[in-house]
Amino acid sequence: MSSVDILVPDLPESVADATVATWHKKPGDAVVRDEVLVEIETDKVVLEVPASADGILDAVLEDEGTTVTSRQILGRLREGNSAGKETSAKSEEKASTPAQRQQASLEEQNNDALSPAIRRLLAEHNLDASAIKGTGVGGRLTREDVEKHLAKAPAKESAPAAAAPAAQPALAARSEKRVPMTRLRKRVAERLLEAKNSTAMLTTFNEVNMKPIMDLRKQYGEAFEKRHGIRLGFMSFYVKAVVEALKRYPEVNASIDGDDVVYHNYFDVSMAVSTPRGLVTPVLRDVDTLGMADIEKKIKELAVKGRDGKLTVEDLTGGNFTITNGGVFGSLMSTPIINPPQSAILGMHAIKDRPMAVNGQVEILPMMYLALSYDHRLIDGRESVGFLVTIKELLEDPTRLLLDV
């Protein structure tokens, strides 16, 4: 049998090193070609390292938590046909009847097919994948399956607690758990602190009447979905309005590099997305060339990749301006933090019915607060306020987005 080195994938120039996150096999385990052996976590994404051939994991040279660099040897794989024999032997030990062997085989395949996000969710809650029924393709576990299982667990535990007399927990029962920060969380912490300490950040606010967009979605939403196969959401309107405002105020689409101001003549917009690993900002590129349907599809694609831990370094690199939507979590108002080296970030919030004065009359309208945080070293009040007013005007008259007026 020949021995094959298991190597760290080539890391982009912007990524200096990585951390061994999870070994899915231990020495002596049989593996098949393209089966995920180990996950490598960078500042931005989790990279899966698959087996290059059938065989047996011969050695693990870098343990979980170790910092590694590009092309470093992680372990060794011994090629051979014994993988099939060992897998068969394990299945025979687990199941004595054909039906049991078939079930064991299915469970083993489904567990191997778990996405990094699902594995991490199971590990965080100390759950056994085999104890949860999967509803995905081929019986695979989905995030919804795990969340439903978690939702049921407290209900079962709360019944006897309700019947028992209330008792104060003993002081000895108080505990703490200390866990190391993930590379992503550490990187997020570093960048947020960098933004606060290295920019002259200021936030300006405005509010927008969302009724015109809501009426437009109500009137054309069904036809839009039938035509394009995607729901007409709010984000495509936000992105379109941002691009038009960036064209009118190029300082907001610029960045500072040393003593120079770099003006970008392209429009790559970062979208703040919450994932099981933390907050990431994948990039929509050349959004000025995209239609509403294309924007909605791109946003959905990036959101799904983020949820499943499939975002690549390329997905997260670049971006000239960021949009964050705290409204999906119920946020009414916030002061978003700039995403360096960008110079501004737009915060969208929850849409709430509020009484507003319209032509001397009080009307109940669906209103949303807008927040623009910007680097005052580059962007002055005229540009920041004008930028935000432009977005307000475009959202309150969405036909202007389509007519480019």
Curated annotation (Swiss-Prot):
Keyword Magnesium: no
Acyltransferase among keywords: yes
List of residues that carry N6-acetyllysine: 148
One annotated Gene Ontology cellular component of this protein: cytosol
Domain annotation Peripheral subunit-binding (PSBD): ranges: 113-150
Residues in Lipoyl-binding domain copies: 3-78
Comp. bias regions, Polar residues: 97-111
Region described as Disordered: 75-111, 153-178
Alphabetized UniProt keyword annotations: Acetylation, Acyltransferase, Lipoyl, Transferase, Tricarboxylic acid cycle
Domain of life: Bacteria
Swiss-Prot/TrEMBL catalytic activity: N(6)-[(R)-dihydrolipoyl]-L-lysyl-[protein] + succinyl-CoA = N(6)-[(R)-S(8)-succinyldihydrolipoyl]-L-lysyl-[protein] + CoA
Low complexity: compositionally biased ranges: 153-173
Sites bearing N6-lipoyllysine, chain numbering: 44
Molecular-function GO term, any one: dihydrolipoyllysine-residue succinyltransferase activity
Function: E2 component of the 2-oxoglutarate dehydrogenase (OGDH) complex which catalyzes the second step in the conversion of 2-oxoglutarate to succinyl-CoA and CO(2).
Record text on subunit structure and interactions: Forms a 24-polypeptide structural core with octahedral symmetry. Part of the 2-oxoglutarate dehydrogenase (OGDH) complex composed of E1 (2-oxoglutarate dehydrogenase), E2 (dihydrolipoamide succinyltransferase) and E3 (dihydrolipoamide dehydrogenase); the complex contains multiple copies of the three enzymatic components (E1, E2 and E3). Interacts with SucA (via N-terminus), the E1 component of OGDH complex.
PANTHER family membership: DIHYDROLIPOYLLYSINE-RESIDUE SUCCINYLTRANSFERASE COMPONENT OF 2-OXOGLUTARATE DEHYDROGENASE COMPLEX, MITOCHONDRIAL, DIHYDROLIPOYLLYSINE-RESIDUE SUCCINYLTRANSFERASE COMPONENT OF 2-OXOGLUTARATE DEHYDROGENASE COMPLEX, MITOCHONDRIAL-RELATED
Name listed for the protein in its UniProt record: Dihydrolipoyllysine-residue succinyltransferase component of 2-oxoglutarate dehydrogenase complex
Origin species: Escherichia coli (strain K12)
Gene this chain is encoded by: sucB
